[in-house]
Amino acid sequence: MYAIMGITGQIGGVVARTLLAAKQPVRAIVRDAIKGQAWSDRGCEVALATIEDRASLATAFREAEGVFLLVPPSFDPLPEFPEAQAIGETLRSALVEANPERVVYLSTIGAQAKQSNLLTQHTIIEKAISGLPIPVTFLRPAWFMENSSWDVAPAMQQGVIPSFLQPLDRPVPMVATADTGKVAAGLLQVAWNGRRVIELEGPHRVTPNEIAATFAKLLDRPVRMEAVPRMSWEALFKSQGMKNPIPRIRMLDGFNEGWIDFERGEVGSQKGNVALETVLKGLIARGH
């Protein structure tokens, strides 16, 4: 039995569908029964649990051959990341109690970075569960291509996409959620010992200008990127409702300055197969 967190989302859904296609039993971990109904209809066992509740998580993880851990993203965390600290301890305690055979945690590129930023939340959770007497894999995917869902409307309507990734010709490690979910499902089904890190990106690194050019091709209209001035970010993010935008700003700095990358660089990462054009085509079709 494979217990899957985040099953109602993009990556968790791919993990579950990949396992089901391989005739593997899946336990869908959901917050409420209504969200689990579709997975129950697919033949999954359903476990009700929340990320804050150790007891329900331990029950959901118990007797699992593999557990896929996915923590909901927090884009506006409190200073010092107390939410991540609490989640890390809850997951650690639940895993100790349940003692599954192996664990795959969906972490992030740059989890090893020393500078504090939005992704430090994953650094904290990695540290919390890294000492478990259970085989643990930290799957560290690159920037998700699906983040370009925010770019669809400006590309279609104005032909100009604001970019926080800059310079616009700087290649950025990116990966599709489909590749991420498939790799996670594969990792769950293979035994290993101890702690390991798998770094994952797409077929090649992508520049913001390439994103614009791909939109232009798919939409059959001129599309270009426009860098959002760094000095305007804090005021802009606060105007959008963020209370503590500094971690997000520092994350963007990390990508732009190169200190958020893979430990082993591009040469040491595993490569997915899904191309940027495939992802953008899907986003356009869904009207994102």
What label would you give each PLM region?
Residues 43-44, 136:
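Short, conserved active-site loop motifs that form the nucleotide-linked donor/cofactor pocket
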Residues 2-27, 31-38, 52-55, 62, ...:
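Oxidoreductase cofactor-interface core, primarily capturing Rossmann-like NAD(P)-dependent enzymes
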Residues 71, 107, 258:
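Short secondary-structure boundary segments
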Residues 49:
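Cofactor-binding loops of NAD(P)H-dependent oxidoreductases
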Residues 83-88:
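Aromatic "clamp/platform" in nucleotide-sugar-dependent glycosyltransferases that forms part
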Residues 18, 230-288:
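A hydrophobic C-terminal alpha-helical subdomain
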